UniProtKB/Swiss-Prot annotation:
Keywords: Repeat, WD repeat
WD repeats: from-to residues: 318-359, 365-405, 408-448, 453-492, 500-540, 542-572, 598-630
Function: Specifically binds 5-hydroxymethylcytosine (5hmC), suggesting that it acts as a specific reader of 5hmC.
Native source species: Rhinolophus ferrumequinum (Greater horseshoe bat)
Lineage: Eukaryota, Metazoa, Chordata, Craniata, Vertebrata
Name of this protein: WD repeat-containing protein 76
Length: 630
């Protein structure tokens, strides 16, 4: 009786708690979202189940506990009947409670509370039913048996059949379950573990290099006692002083003083060379200085130029390197042309001698490029050559030697010209911008004056043909005219400066007969003609001619030079195709173009014209001379 009262009180308490939880949920119905984690937590909180089984005490003996047959025999009919009875009672109790409570709530939190209360009521009904039998009392506590497993599965399956969840919540739970199953099927953790193993396998193990063990009884290699600097007894010898190694100069200076005129391509004792020296001396006796030079008309001049042609007999390689200077012997009997090369050679070619190979003689009076070359106007038997090596030499045919006229080992020379008509004094330009006055009548090979100019570099020097006290210099970007009478060693200012140039100037020359014109060749691809008829503070610019002067580093720079027979025409090489040599008038008109066909296939950077005859010689960067003549 007391047991039934206690059960009734517990039932009443559980109903009150259930009612409080339902009311508590109703107060929170306006919440935007309710988590379902509490439902899962409520279902999983059950850890121990108590089951009352009918048990008979008639066969019980003292000191012995015997399980009923229905529990020992798993296949007995009583066990199956008990399971079916339990399932039926659970379903009935849950259905009855849910029917009365689901009308007032639709939330997942209330459903979890109802699930817990229904399980509690089911347990109480079973206890009351089993306690009503007076001769049966059974207490079973099972946490790990197969019967509890079956009851858990049955309870879970019964909970799955609940229809209290809304369709949205059912769909949400289904999606969560499907997503969890999908990610589990991907086996991401296993893939990550495999990748981690692969990365770890790729790293090679650090292996320490084993040091070779030295053999104790290893015999050393034999060594030279001379290299060890010891004597046979093992005593060290005194250290011998080492001599400094001398670096061979690529272009060593030739010894000072006169040099013998020995041809490098011939035997100096050959009959041909002796005949050549004799011919040179004979033709030099005939002087052309008394011949009057008359300026022909432009029409006549063009007609004479048209008759000048080139052939294979007038093309020959005279020097070993590029040609830097060319000069004609003034003889009208023989055609003798001289060329100064980059290698320091000076070549002489007698075009009247056949075969042409026998008329070429090559000498080595310098060790560096020969940039300026002239035959003496007073004595054509003298050939003067100036080189970068700082020497100015005179080749004398009568004595067959190259005399040293001027020597300066501190500065490189660039150009020179004759200050006096008798060729006794010279004006010499240096690459560092200084100017030297040299007098051949003074013993020795030194200068009379050394003047520092305002130019940083001097490329060419040229003396006025009439007023010989004036000379013009071409520098980096300026062209200056000086008066030789006003030169002082401390420094001299130019009389006039031609500032129209924008880039470096290759050359500047007075016109050959009167000196009334000046022509300059500039790297800005322009030829400029100035009016120098009056040497005053201003020299006006007359004409500018566009002409390509960009030769590059492998070709000698182009220079425009005057034709000695014509006061108003200049000759210059061309970069145009086909290769040619052009003649321009001071007005800018192109007077003539010398085309050679297959005989002229290179650029003739350096050109010269015979002073009295219509003969043109052009030198290229391989040492060849191309001659156009009537």
């Amino acid at each position: 009786m007391s047991g039934s009262c206690a059960a009734a009180e517990e039932k009443e308490g559980s109903r009150q708690r259930l009612q409080m939880k339902v009311n508590e949920y109703k107060e929170n119905q306006n919440m935007s979202s309710v988590s379902l984690r509490s439902i899962q937590k409520t279902v999983l909180e059950k850890t121990v189940k108590v089951c009352l089984v009918p048990f008979s005490l008639s066969n019980y003996k003292s000191g012995q506990f015997k399980l009923p047959k229905s529990l020992l025999d798993k296949n007995s009919k009583n066990e199956v009947a008990c399971k079916k009875y339990k399932k039926t009672e659970i379903k009935k109790a849950c259905t009855r409670i849910l029917t009365s409570k689901m009308e007032a709530t639709a939330s997942s939190k209330a459903e979890s509370t109802l699930q817990k209360s229904s399980i509690d009521v089911h347990t109480e009904n079973n206890q009351r039913q089993h306690k009503s039998t007076s001769d049966t009392v059974s207490l079973g506590v099972d946490t790990e048996s197969s019967q509890d497993g079956d009851s858990d599965e049955d309870t879970t399956s019964s909970l799955d059949d609940f229809s209290g969840l809304s369709p949205y919540e059912r769909k949400r739970l289904k999606n969560i379950s499907e997503n969890a199953n999908f990610f589990a099927s991907l086996q991401l953790s296993e893939s990550a573990a495999r990748l981690r193993e692969m990365i770890e396998k790729r790293q090679p193990p650090e292996t320490k290099r084993k040091k070779p063990k030295k053999k104790e009884n290893e015999t050393g290699c034999r060594r030279s006692m001379r290299l060890l600097n010891v004597d046979p007894s093992g005593v060290s010898l005194p250290v011998t002083p080492t001599e400094p190694t001398l670096v061979a100069d690529e272009n060593p200076l030739l010894p000072p003083g006169p040099l013998e005129m020995i041809p490098e391509n011939r035997d100096d004792n050959s009959e041909l060379f002796k005949e050549f020296l004799q011919t040179w001396a004979e033709v030099s006796k005939t002087s052309s200085k008394n011949i009057e030079k008359e300026l022909s008309s432009l029409k006549t001049y063009k007609a004479n130029l048209s008759g000048m042609v080139i052939s294979e007999d007038t093309v020959y390689k005279v020097t070993k390197g590029a040609i830097f200077s060319i000069a004609f012997h003034p003889s009208e009997i023989k055609t003798l042309v001289a060329a100064g090369a980059k290698s320091g050679q000076v070549g002489l070619w007698d075009l009247t001698h056949q075969p042409k190979e026998d008329g070429v003689y090559v000498f080595q009076p310098h060790s560096q490029p020969v940039s300026c070359l002239y035959f003496s106007p007073a004595n054509p038997a003298h050939m003067l050559s100036l080189s970068y090596d700082g020497t100015l030499r005179c080749g004398d045919i009568s004595s067959a030697v190259f005399e040293e006229v001027y020597r300066n080992e501190r500065s490189s020379l660039s150009s020179f010209d004759f200050l006096a008509e008798d060729a006794s004094t010279f004006i010499v330009g240096h690459w560092d911008g200084s100017i030297s006055l040299v007098d051949r009548r003074t013993p020795g090979a030194s200068y009379e004056k050394l003047i520092s100019s305002s130019l940083r570099k001097i490329r060419t020097v040229h003396v006025h043909p009439v007023q010989r006290q004036y000379f013009i210099t071409a520098g980096l970007r300026d062209t200056h005219i000086y008066d030789a009478r006003r030169l002082t060693p401390s420094g001299s200012q130019p009389l006039i400066s031609l500032t129209e140039h924008t880039k470096s100037i290759a050359s500047a020359y007075f016109s050959p007969l009167t000196g009334n014109r000046i022509v300059t060749t500039c790297a800005d691809c322009k030829l400029r003609f100035f009016d120098s008829s009056c040497i005053s503070s201003q020299i006006p610019l007359l004409t500018t001619i566009r002409h390509n002067t960009i030769t590059g580093r492998w070709l000698t720079r182009l220079r425009a030079v005057w034709d000695p027979k014509q006061e108003d025409c200049v000759i210059i090489g061309s970069m145009a195709h086909p290769r040619q040599v052009e003649i321009f008038h001071e007005t800018g008109e192109q007077v003539h173009s010398f085309l050679g066909g297959e005989c002229l296939v290179s650029v003739c950077s350096i050109n010269a014209v015979h002073p009295t005859r219509y003969i043109l010689a052009g030198g290229n960067s391989s040492g060849k001379i191309h001659v156009f003549m009537n």
